[in-house]
């Protein structure tokens, strides 16, 4: 058989073809790695019945989920009550037809037991998990008191008289969390009302469960935890896991007079008793989270304070350790 001899030109052409093939494969892998796998919209601390424009704020969150064709919608607690006014707001929430999830906030059980509230909101339990695509999502319950001997669940506002005992994840739940994480091979993202990094009194014990699972798996398996409660916004990394505080959709609680008479008419301040001690946002706040094989992109809403703004009432840029901000900053997480 007469074989065609290799030449420098044919070798060069072959090398170029091989290089282009490798580059194309690399580009394909890169494209697949950055392709959105799951997108969800998250909001926190709407307090929809306690602000004058609660319905409008809820509609904005629902419209965002619909507009972006989100895979699911989740709120991180302090949402609505179960009375008739709350039911009307829940019909707004139902305007998003996809899966919707709830986290127990402390104010959600100001008038109810956990059993009553979870049943009224059609939640699978006070803590639970679910899968979507390549990801495993875990919802925790920090509405528990501990006096050094006994764990007591929040119920009908009982936590208000025991401020030093609040914000615990109970042992039963910790044990469940340990087994729930170990039972999945998917990357894990957590939701809680009280932050695991700062607010939970036994947050270190919760973080140890998360970090231990990453050590057991030998990879970044638990990657992100989102929380609310403090009406603030920040992102930090502890033990290789990213923790992000999702700001309230509605306002920051200041806890002292904020010259609200310059913000709202007298009838509004009288009807909504939180307003004189709070500072509202000009826009509803929420975030869109896009998950890929490479990481997460969090796109937040930027707003301003309804005047008078913090410096006009003698406030600085934080309340304790929490930033005083009217926005949810964009963030990116790599894994």
Model-derived segments and their meaning:
Residues 45, 77-78, 105-106, 193, ...:
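Active-site glycine-centered loops adjacent to acidic/histidine catalytic or metal-binding residues
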Residues 28-88:
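N-terminal active-site segment of His-dependent metallophosphoesterases
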Residues 268-335:
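A short C-terminal boundary segment appended to hydrolase-like catalytic domains
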Residues 179-198:
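Short acidic, glycine-rich surface-loop motifs adjacent to enzyme active sites
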Residues 40, 73, 137, 188-189:
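Hydrophobic beta-strand anchors of alpha/beta hydrolase catalytic cores
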Residues 142, 191-196, 229, 301-302:
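Short, well-ordered beta-to-alpha junction loops that form the rim of enzyme active sites
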Residues 2-18:
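Bacterial N-terminal signal peptides that target proteins for export
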Residues 85-183, 205-222, 232-280, 285-290:
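Extended active-site neighborhood of metal-dependent phosphoesterases/phosphodiesterases
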């Amino acid at each position: 058989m007469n074989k065609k001899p290799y030449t420098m030109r044919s070798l060069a052409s072959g090398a170029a073809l091989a290089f282009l093939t490798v580059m194309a494969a690399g580009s394909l892998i890169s494209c697949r790695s950055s392709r959105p796998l799951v997108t969800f919209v998250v909001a926190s601390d709407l307090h929809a019945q306690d602000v004058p424009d609660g319905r409008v704020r809820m509609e904005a969150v629902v419209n965002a989920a619909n507009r972006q064709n989100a895979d699911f919608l989740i709120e991180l607690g302090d949402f609505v009550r179960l009375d008739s006014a709350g039911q009307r707001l829940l019909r707004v929430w139902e305007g998003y037809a996809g899966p919707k999830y709830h986290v127990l906030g402390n104010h959600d059980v100001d008038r109810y037991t956990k059993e009553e509230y979870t049943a009224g909101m059609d939640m699978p339990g006070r803590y639970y998990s679910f899968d979507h695509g390549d990801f495993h999502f875990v919802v925790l319950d920090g509405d528990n008191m501990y006096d050094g001997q006994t764990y007591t669940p929040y119920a009908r506002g009982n936590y208000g008289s025991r401020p030093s005992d609040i914000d615990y994840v109970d042992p039963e739940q910790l044990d469940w969390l340990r087994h729930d994480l170990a039972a999945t091979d998917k990357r894990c993202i957590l939701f809680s009302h009280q932050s695991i990094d700062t607010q939970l009194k036994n947050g270190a014990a919760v973080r140890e469960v998360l970090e231990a699972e990453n050590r057991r798996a030998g990879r970044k398996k638990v990657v992100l935890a989102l929380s609310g409660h403090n009406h603030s916004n920040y992102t930090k990394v502890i033990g290789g896991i990213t923790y992000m505080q999702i700001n309230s959709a509605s306002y920051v609680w200041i806890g002292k007079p904020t010259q609200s008479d310059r913000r709202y008419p007298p009838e509004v301040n009288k009807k909504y008793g939180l307003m004189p001690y709070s500072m509202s946002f000009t826009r509803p706040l929420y975030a869109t989270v896009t998950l890929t094989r490479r990481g997460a992109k969090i796109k937040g809403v930027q707003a301003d304070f309804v005047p008078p703004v913090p410096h006009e009432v003698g406030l600085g840029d934080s309340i304790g350790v929490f930033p005083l901000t009217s926005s949810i900053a964009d963030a990116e997480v790599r894994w």
